[in-house]
Amino acid sequence: MTSTQAVSFDTFQLAAATADLSDESAASDYADIVEFRLDLAYADTSLPDPLTAISAYDHSSSLPLIVTNRPEWEGGAYDGETIDRLEMLITAAKHDAVIAVDIELETLKSQHGKKVARDIRNSGAVIIASTHDFTSTPQQSVLHERLHTAAQLGDIGKLAVTAQTHRDALRVLAATEQASQWGDTVATMAMGALGQHTRVVAPLYGSRIGYAPVNPTDATAPGQYDIKTLSEMIDTLTHTKVEDD
């Protein structure tokens, strides 16, 4: 298990994605961080209020948190007002357990989004600027531009697209490697069956965050492995690479 103080996005971090912070204990053997989906928790009436759940979270002995409050227009579950959605993120970032906040790239392009990012950074959390395409993979030049812009507006640029061909997956890996060469800190993956393997190999090309649900039935994006499976595959691949080198 990784302590909050020890986490650095200079190296790869594996995040267990969940709407229920009680999943942390099951994830702690495999994950470095928990991605807490406020939008999914807020939409599920059987779960505690997400901000209350963060307040009750024992950060001293638990994994640190990335908080995400994804709107419906970016594939999430939050259907309320933008100002309320972002205020939840600002409030969440004030808790010691929260080390990173995910905000959509389109939101960060607005003046209000930039102000929200400043407020969150003032609380000590970093910004993950995320962009998603749930239907296709853009051309290489678009991938480079979108990922670089995300890395500039955020502290980490996150790009998730949908692979319709194996070549799409290769383009994502190429964009990841190029971004790393430019000095950008990025997290990348290709969603869908044809992009599933990128979740395992992207760290070799410079991706700094991987995402997986604790339970495969709770996947928050197409093509996700469960946290145990992804952790074991990445560990095997990384150790094999070290031995080959």
Swiss-Prot record:
Q: What is its EC number?
A: 4.2.1.10
Record Pfam families: DHquinase_I
Alphabetically sorted, this entry's keywords are:
Amino-acid biosynthesis, Aromatic amino acid biosynthesis, Lyase, Schiff base
Record: active site? H132, K158
Q: Where does 3-dehydroquinate bind?
A: E35, F36, R37, R70, R199, T220, Q224
Q: Which InterPro entries match?
A: Aldolase_TIM (IPR013785), DHquinase_I (IPR001381), Type-I_3-dehydroquinase (IPR050146)
According to its UniProt entry, the protein's GO biological process terms are:
3,4-dihydroxybenzoate biosynthetic process; amino acid biosynthetic process; aromatic amino acid family biosynthetic process; chorismate biosynthetic process
- A GO molecular-function descriptor: 3-dehydroquinate dehydratase activity
Q: To which pathway does this protein belong?
A: Metabolic intermediate biosynthesis; chorismate biosynthesis; chorismate from D-erythrose 4-phosphate and phosphoenolpyruvate: step 3/7
Kindly state which reaction or reactions the protein catalyses.
3-dehydroquinate = 3-dehydroshikimate + H2O
The UniProt entry's sequence similarity note says: Belongs to the type-I 3-dehydroquinase family.
Task: State the protein's purpose.
Answer: Involved in the third step of the chorismate pathway, which leads to the biosynthesis of aromatic amino acids. Catalyzes the cis-dehydration of 3-dehydroquinate (DHQ) and introduces the first double bond of the aromatic ring to yield 3-dehydroshikimate.
Task: Summarize the subunit comment.
Answer: Homodimer.
What the entry lists under HAMAP family is as follows: AroD
Q: What is this protein called?
A: 3-dehydroquinate dehydratase
Q: Which source organism does the UniProt entry give?
A: Haloquadratum walsbyi (strain DSM 16790 / HBSQ001)
Read off the lineage from the record: Archaea, Methanobacteriati, Methanobacteriota, Stenosarchaea group, Halobacteria
Give the gene that encodes this protein.
aroD
